[in-house]
Amino acid sequence: MSLRSAEVVICGAGIAGISTAWQLAVKHGMRNVVLADPWPPMTLTSDKSTEAYRNWWPGPDDAMVRLMNRSIDLLEDMAETSNDRFLMNRRGYVYTTADPIRAKKMQAEGVLASSYGAGPLRIHTGGAGGPDYLPAPSEGWRGQPDGADLILEESLLRKTFPYLSPATLAVLHARRCGWFSGQQLGMLMLEEARAAGVEVIEGRVEWIETTGGKVSSTQIGTRSEVISVSAPRFVVTAGPMLTSVGALLGIELPVFSELHLKIAVEDHLGVVPRDAPFLIWEDPQHLGWSDEEREFVAELSDGELLLGEMPPGVHTRIEGGGGSRYLLILLSLIHI
């Protein structure tokens, strides 16, 4: 067993662990930061993210809006200083519905999100003196409005989003939203953290020593040895392994994992244009299986999830640059 010392041990080298190490070492000058993970950085769940962001949160209070406004400020600063290495865009989130009741709820939620600090709600009904609508660019984030545009005027809706279902009655385009390359962001922060002295150990945290109710050391098992790191601070950024790490401290954490399904499909018909924003369908729906497909799906172990009513909130965005024709489709079905 080899012995080392550090100011802090961070357990988990996903985006949360890397950003923690980056903040401590790069922004706050902390030295002797250890980042431990049995897998290479950004390879468990962080590289499988939607990679999207939004400040549009209609409750239950203003906590998420304040958190995300600050987070987006930080992202913009990093994009500026790195020449947008992680390709952050400001295409926005477009919430859509064919339900008039849901359309009214979207307006009420928009008023609420605006009151929490997400920016003004601009309502487009086609009346004289109404607000102007500024389409979002496909790249970049500078010079874009915040808040949201609620489009109820049919002609503007069809002109701006001709690819949406003809049944669509309302569109809420939240503006301080978009996506970026999470992998590139993680690698950028990791490079800067390492340059500031952060040590990455590819190993599993196997034991956490406490003295007087305080962390005193951490044992990390690598392929070749066990490393004991004397450190008074231990940060858990273990993602889906959170309960396992908690058990090392004798703590049963009341958390669960939620299965988010991400499907990549080739849009060979070009249904969704490559400059489209992040699209969310707010209504429940059924998938239009043929009789043959329905019979096949019914034989799958969880086939009933796909044959019944799909929950609201299924969303999609384009994936890849250049000549890519792929879409990402994301939905949440069950807890595991």
Question: Can you name each region flagged by the protein language model?
Answer:
Residues 16, 41, 241:
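Conserved Rossmann-like nucleotide-cofactor binding loop
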